[in-house]
Swiss-Prot record:
It comes from Oryza sativa subsp. japonica. This is ABC transporter G family member 40. The gene is ABCG40. The lineage of its organism: Eukaryota, Viridiplantae, Streptophyta, Embryophyta, Tracheophyta. One of its GO terms (molecular function) is ATP hydrolysis activity. ATP 1 binds at residues 209-216. Belongs to the ABC transporter superfamily. ABCG family. PDR (TC 3.A.1.205) subfamily. It is a multi-pass membrane protein.
Length: 1466
């Protein structure tokens, strides 16, 4: 309606006399009343005319411009609000515009278009796309993947040699070197065994198989992403072409089961970057051809589809509408602008991160998708909708897809066309889904009615599970092995048909030109560099705190150094003044260099994501290297500027402006060189422990030969090449020449022993430095050369080096027929055991031969847990306050009541965000923040957390365990500290063995635990270990958080059978569960169902076949009845969803609160809140089960076991110690036997300083990752009340002390003999004591920083602040007596200064000889040490006491920090 007509109507309605216009309006309204559709039809006609005009204008444009213009509704260019209106409204009165597609590709317009395209469903949208393509006769590319006789093998150590002990690691290393020239002792493991198959286009294949069957290996092999250390046999072809003829990495997309992303990027930014790098494929060419044919045929396409296709065909955009489409389809639009996060940065949930991993590959143009375990952490509804979209993509767009799923529910399973069943490396079945049950029935096995087919398929090949599915009553059951199944499939008609198809070669003439990708990267080199540079800028912005912290740290150090080397205390002009100026220059140089040390950490941190992107051909590796180099140039500029501007004039350096800018130039190129060096070291060393150990060794070499510690003339001939190869030497020359060739040092030289005209030249010559101005520019040129060299080597390392992978290991137990195979994080974890799973008893009574309480060695007291009107609040998050929420608190649990009883297994279920884990944490007392309201009682008495921790167990979802111990050692350790002190050792071990048998870990008792996803146990085995560790405490109540999350159906069955066995012993067990299968769900006795917001909507028994739950919901008006055979858990969550509540206009929480069931539950709570007759409240005489002494012994036992099996830390410790010792011994070879001059003494002083400081700093930094991993374990064990924090600190310090003693002896023997110190027993043992003590306090200091900070990264940054201060006040760069009086206290507070004092005093303080000094005279050595260095021999007793004091102080701070500082926020 026009504005005039509308105004007339308003005027009429307001009572004014009707005008001529209002009369016409009234007449028009009467006509409308007679024909209500006329107006809408008229307006639609107007829109169509306008659209035709716009389209005609578009058709007149050149092809290039036409591909970048589209006809769209104006509303889409505003805010998209109208998309939420009815279709009739959306189609009337809306103008259309001819717009630049670039406006439509991003922002609200893109989201509005995606909303409109997907308003019905994804299938309709894809069909609209396909209809346009078919209308002009365009054929879509198709890909067929064939694999014939495919075998994959790996080499691994076997038996006891597979355990990573220090002795084994040394033997394996030596034999590995020998094996390069001879035979290897590794055993060949067959991962895939001559498998055959065809993946066809327009068919979606489900890959099923138990853990270690080879699923990931098969997918990686088919996509060309197998580790190069694996041996591959057989043929893999795409449309008849071998891998050498195209790039499989880009033709197909592999979605890994591991989630590797930049934690600081948002979900949208992550997908945008992958889409940008993966490119558009053939979309632009196809769209151009479609547009040409439409134009020739006079066809006008659907404007919205045309606009969408043009937007997706735009190459090189930073963001694109494809990202919005994938976000919407995967349900990530609600968290699109949330950072991904990691274990230290709070971000999206695990399920959302899994979808990000999937979406990352879906944004690309690949037409073959192989997706590995994409459902981990997702509920069945999300999995179903994602797989359904992929099914539409396959069937409508002719894509080729294989998906591996864990526990696929029946509705998801039925979406697939084909099934591949893989077991023990054999293909048991590969063919249509409809025929797989027929194949197994032909072999005598039938799937029960209420059994999910996918669960049946994963259990029927298991020796332990197979018999229950045998249905031929007239024939005796006989185990059918996996190889037998594989042979039977070959003779089955489906297998015969597939073999025939494989024998017919693929007709290469039929292949679509765009099917296979022959270009290595989607983008040009410039576009790739631009994309990576934009991402690195973004990451740098997100890490701005780190760079601000570094600059702040530099400013603080600058002010500290200014006050030490204050110009008023820095006289110049005399030869003796040069030492202090050289010390100041050297400290400045070290600070600027070491401030770039964080680049090592940042480089190592980026590598996992880089390797993924490199291997997936996102970009050429050199672009990543160049981007990181360029982005850090401003950092070097800022840090060099800050340091020089603050320090130069205050320290009293040469005042000329030219000298100022030359020093700035020297520090700037030095910082660039240091950053390049650290980047290069990070790229080749790859892990933090190795990077720190060998990186510090490289820095030591660079520093020692830097021109200050030892003069060039005093360097041994075999090391002189290192002097010329040390970048720091050129930096030292540049800054020294710049200072000492200034006019104020041009005073005539009076020292006849040095051939130099001026004092400045004499100082330079005395240190072996260049003496001409040419030396400055030569040094700058050399540093630029090093910058180019290190950056080039960095790029080459990125391009050609593969990630460091953990050693392959295989443990074989001939008696138990168990194999455990561990490989790398990027390669599939494989572990095979002949005793796997059996079905969970569906009876709530748990029929079968289960252990009962009477069968256990140790009795326990059954307890019930009641909670009434429970509420939980947290402070309102700042993000939510910014969105306008004014409340101060956010309620996560709302009026929850319930009871958990002995012998009953209770399921705690709800959608994501319902508060399942929150409720469990509140009940278990694990919350560290928030406010709890309501009552919690334990068998009638109020719950006290101190005693409750002793009688309860909590199985966390994360499965946190010490990685370097065996399964048996983990469980025994838990039993040792958690069982009562009156339980003797033999009884304790018997109980441990009973528990291991209960959870079916007895066959894995000697297996290493390892790190999740990296080494050791599989996910399912770790779950059982978590249960065993808690069960061995003999608890009455056990909480389990998501015990089946991330497991396949068979592994979940093992875990749930373990849980069921635990309940049958009479314990109270509560599990949170995430979308369980029918088998798992009906193994529970009771259910507590929560809705979003932490409100109860059902609490009560499940009943046989869940009939009580079903009856309750079916009595609610509007709830649809459950379909026969449908999973009650899935049905329950579907009918109680928020959408269903809105549809029925009900609140299920209110319905429950007003129900008879609620009143019965309240009566039960009241009944259980009264203590039973004769029952007393729990009371323990001591806080912990064991005495402090036993706690220390047990903790030390575990740490000893852990350290012995941690060669990556301890073997590396001793190897680097040997190399450090060898280096110092050869550099300062027999220097201790020749002490004729003051310079000789100073050279030895420099050797002592460097020998102590650098290896100590290495210890300090390398211990931090180890302690950080163990701290996470400590938080779990401490929450369980296992031991005192001080006993843990004692054990951690003690085991380090032991290893440090060995390290100190090794180091002392090497350098003491090679440097040539005096072989007197007293001097040797003094030296040994100070070296061992320094190793200890450095190590304890590193441990202390970890305990005081929330992350190892922050602790590492603090080290880069502390170590320069220790270095400055160590007594070498500036002697004690030269330190200003206001800073001399820090000399005594610095442990390194005490060690250097002790070594110098013990070795040389008591010597009676004299040495020559500048000027030619001779002075007693003890006199020089006292007057110049400030060292006295008679002070040694105090020095020894100081070392004990520093060690004790750091250990105590570590212990009390562990006790009082809890950085785990729950």
């Amino acid at each position: 309606m026009s504005h005039r007509h509308h105004a007339a109507l308003v005027a009429s309605a307001s009572g004014r006399s009707p005008s001529w216009g209002s009369a016409i309006s009234q007449s028009f309204r009467q006509v409308e009343a007679e024909d209500p559709f006329r107006r809408a039809q008229s307006m639609r006609g107007h829109d169509e005319e306008e659209e035709d005009l716009r389209w005609a204008a578009l058709e007149k444009l050149p092809t290039y411009d036409r591909m970048r213009r589209g006809v769209v509704r104006s509303a889409l260019l505003r805010d998209g609000d109208d998309d939420h209106k009815d279709d009739d409204d959306a189609g009337t009165g809306k103008a259309v515009e001819l717009v630049d597609i670039g406006r439509l590709a991003t922002g609200d317009a893109a989201r509005a278009l995606v909303e409109r395209l997907l308003q019905d469903d994804s299938e309709r949208f894809l069909r609209r796309l396909r209809d346009r393509i078919d209308m002009v006769g365009i054929e879509l590319p198709k890909i067929e993947i064939r694999y014939e006789e495919l075998s994959v093998q790996a080499d691994a150590f076997v038996a006891s040699r597979a355990l990573p002990t220090l002795s084994n690691s040394a033997i394996n290393f030596l034999q590995g070197l020998i094996g390069q020239f001879g035979s290897s002792n590794k055993k060949t493991i067959n991962i895939l065994k001559q498998v055959n198959g065809i993946l066809k286009s327009s068919r979606m294949t489900l890959l099923l198989g138990p853990p270690s069957s080879g699923k990931s290996t098969l997918m990686r092999a088919l996509t060309g992403k197998l580790d190069k250390n694996l041996k591959v046999f057989g043929n893999i072809t795409y449309c008849g072409h071998k891998f050498s003829e195209f790039y499989p990495e880009r033709t197909s997309a592999y979605v890994s089961q591991y989630d590797l992303h930049n934690a600081e990027m948002t979900v949208r930014e992550t997908l945008d970057f992958s889409r940008w790098c993966l490119g558009i494929g053939s979309r632009y060419d196809m769209l151009t051809e479609i547009s040409r044919r439409e134009r020739n045929a006079g066809i006008k396409p659907d404007p919205e589809i045309d606009a969408f296709m043009k937007a997706t065909a735009m190459q090189g955009q930073e963001t694109n509408i494809i990202t919005d489409l994938i976000l919407k389809v995967l349900g990530l639009d609600i968290c699109a602008d949330t950072i991904v996060g990691d274990e230290m940065i709070r971000g999206i949930s695990g399920g959302q991160m899994k979808r990000v991993t999937t979406g990352e590959m879906l944004t690309g143009p690949a037409r073959a998708l192989l997706m590995d375990e994409i459902s981990t952490g997702l509920d069945s509804s999300s999995t179903f909708h994602i797989v359904k979209f992929i099914r539409h993509l396959v069937h409508i767009m002719n894509e080729t897809v294989m998906i591996s799923l864990l526990q696929p529910p029946p509705e998801t399973y039925n979406l697939f066309d084909d099934i591949v069943l893989l077991s023990e490396g054999y293909i048991v079945y590969h063919g249509p889904r409809e025929n797989i049950l027929e194949f197994f029935e032909a072999s005598g096995f039938r799937c029960p009615q209420r059994k999910a087919v996918a669960d049946f398929l994963q259990e029927v090949t298991s020796k332990k599970d197979q018999q229950q599915y045998w249905f031929l009553d007239k024939e005796p059951y006989c185990y059918v092995s996996v190889p037998e199944f594989a042979e039977r499939f070959k003779s089955f008609y489906i297998g015969q048909q597939m073999m025939k198809e494989q024998h017919i070669p693929f007709e290469k003439s039929k292949i679509h030109p765009a099917a296979l990708t022959t270009m290595k990267n989607a983008l040009s080199n410039w576009e790739s560099l631009k994309a990576v540079l934009c991402r690195e800028k973004l990451l740098m912005k997100r890490n701005s705190f780190l760079y601000i912290f570094k600059v702040t740290q530099l400013i603080i150090l600058a002010f500290l150094s200014m006050t030490v080397f204050l110009r008023t205390k820095m006289p110049h002009g005399q030869f003796s003044d040069g030492t202090k100026f050289l010390g100041a220059l050297t400290f400045n140089l070290i600070t600027v260099m070491f401030n770039g040390l964080s680049e090592l950490n940042l480089t190592v941190k980026k590598l996992p994501v880089f390797y993924k992107h490199r291997d997936f051909l996102f970009f050429p590796p050199w672009t990543f290297g160049v981007a990181n180099i360029l982005i850090k140039v401003p950092v070097s500029l800022v840090e060099a500027t800050v340091w020089v501007v603050i320090t130069y004039y205050v320290m009293g350096f040469a005042p000329a402006a030219g000298r100022f800018f030359r020093q700035f130039l020297a520090f700037f190129v030095t910082h660039l060189m240091a950053m390049a060096l650290f980047r290069f070291l990070g790229a080749i060393l790859q892990t933090m422990v190795i990077a720190i150990s060998f990186g510090m060794l490289v820095l030591l070499i660079v520093f020692v030969f830097g021109g200050f510690v030892i003069r060039k003339n005093d360097i041994r001939p075999w090391w002189i090449w290192c002097y010329w190869a040390s970048p720091m030497m050129y930096s030292q020359n540049a800054i020294s020449i710049n200072e000492f060739l200034a006019s104020r040092w041009a005073i005539p030289n009076n020292d006849t022993t040095i051939d130099a005209k001026t004092v400045g030249e004499a100082i330079l010559k005395s240190k072996g430095l260049f003496t001409g101005e040419w030396g400055f520019w030569l040094s700058i040129g050399a540093l630029v050369g090093f910058i180019i060299l290190f950056n080039t080597l960095y790029i080459l390392a990125l391009t050609y080096l593969s990630p460091i992978r953990s050693a392959n290991a295989l443990v074989i137990d001939e008696h138990n027929e168990t194999e455990l195979y561990t490989e790398t994080r990027n390669e599939e974890h494989r572990s095979r055991t002949s005793t796997t799973t059996s079905s969970i008893p569906t009876s709530a009574n748990g029929e079968g031969n289960r252990p009962t309480q009477s069968q256990f060695v140790l009795p326990f007291q059954p307890l019930s847990l009641c909670f009434n009107h429970l509420n939980y609040y947290v402070d309102m998050p700042s993000e939510m306050k910014q969105q306008g929420l004014m409340e101060s608190r956010l309620q996560l649990l709302s009026d929850i009541s319930g009871a958990f009883r002995p012998g009953l297994l209770t399921a705690l279920v709800g959608v994501s965000g319902a508060g399942k884990t929150t409720l469990m944490d509140v009940l278990a007392g694990r919350k560290t923040s928030g406010t709890i309201e309501g009552s919690i009682t334990l068998s009638g008495y109020s719950k006290k957390q101190e005693t409750f921790a002793r009688i309860s167990g909590y199985c966390e979802q994360a499965d946190i365990h010490s990685p370097n111990v065996t399964v048996y050692e983990s469980i025994l350790y838990s039993a040792w500290l958690r069982l009562p002190s009156d339980v003797d050792s033999n009884t304790r071990k018997m109980f441990v063995e009973e528990v291991m048998a209960l959870v079916e870990l007895d066959v894995l008792c000697n297996a290493m635990v390892g790190l999740p996803g990296v080494s050791g146990l599989s996910t399912e085995q770790r779950k059982r270990l978590t249960i065993a560790v808690e069960l061995v405490a003999n608890p009455s109540i056990i909480f389990m958080d998501e015990p089946t999350s991330g497991l396949d159906a068979r592994a979940a069955a093992i875990v749930m059978r373990t849980v069921r066995n635990t309940v049958n012993t009479g314990r109270t067990v509560v599990c949170t569960i995430h979308q369980p299968s029918i088998d798992i769900f009906e193994s529970f006795d009771e259910l507590l169902l929560l809705k979003r917001g932490g409100r109860v909507i059902y609490a009560g028994e499940l009943g046989d076949h869940s009939h009580k739950l079903v009856e309750y919901f079916e009595t609610i008006l509007g709830v649809p009845s459950i379909t026969e055979g449908y999973n009650p858990a899935t049905w329950m969550l579907e009918v109680s969803s928020t959408l269903e509540e809105a549809r029925m206009n009900v609140d299920f929480a209110e319905i429950y609160a007003n129900s008879l069931l609620y009143r019965k539950n309240q009566e039960l709570i009241e009944e259980l809140s009264i203590p039973p007759p004769g029952y007393r409240d729990l009371l323990f005489a001591t806080k912990y089960s064991q005495s402090f002494y036993i706690q220390c012994v047990a903790n030390l036992w575990k740490q000893y076991k852990s350290y012995w099996k941690n060669p990556s830390y301890n073997s590396l410790r001793y190897l680097t110690t040997f190399l450090y010792g060898l280096f110092f011994g050869t550099v300062f070879w027999q220097k201790g036997t020749k002490l004729d001059s003051q310079q000789d003494l100073y050279n030895l002083l420099g050797a002592t300083y460097a020998a102590i400081f650098f290896i100590g700093a290495t210890n300090c930094m390398s211990v931090q990752p180890v302690v950080s991993i163990e701290r996470a374990v400590y938080y779990r064990e401490s929450a369980a009340g296992m031991y005192s924090p001080l006993s843990y600190a004692f054990a951690q310090a003690s085991v380090e002390f032991i290893y440090n003693i060995i390290q100190g002896i090794l180091y002392t023997v090497i350098i003491y003999a090679m440097i040539g110190y005096d072989w007197k027993a007293s001097k040797f043992f003094y030296f040994l004591f100070f070296i061992v003590s320094s190793f200890n306090y450095f190590t304890f200091f590193g441990m202390m920083l970890v305990a005081c900070t929330p992350s190892a990264l922050l602790a590492n940054i603090l080290i880069t602040f502390a170590l320069p201060l220790w270095n400055l006040f160590a007594g070498f760069l500036i002697f004690r007596k030269a330190i200003p009086i206001w800073w001399r206290w820090y000399y005594w507070a610095n442990p390194v200064s005490w060690t250097i004092y002790g070594v110098i005093a013990s070795q040389f303080g008591g010597n009676g000889g004299s040495i020559s000094v500048p000027g030619g005279s001779h002075v007693a050595m003890s006199q020089i040490l006292e007057d110049n260095v400030g060292v006295r021999h008679d002070f040694l007793g105090y020095v020894i006491l100081a070392h004990f004091g520093f060690m004790a102080a750091f250990v105590l701070i570590f212990g009390y920090s562990i006790k009082f500082l809890n950085f785990q926020k729950r």
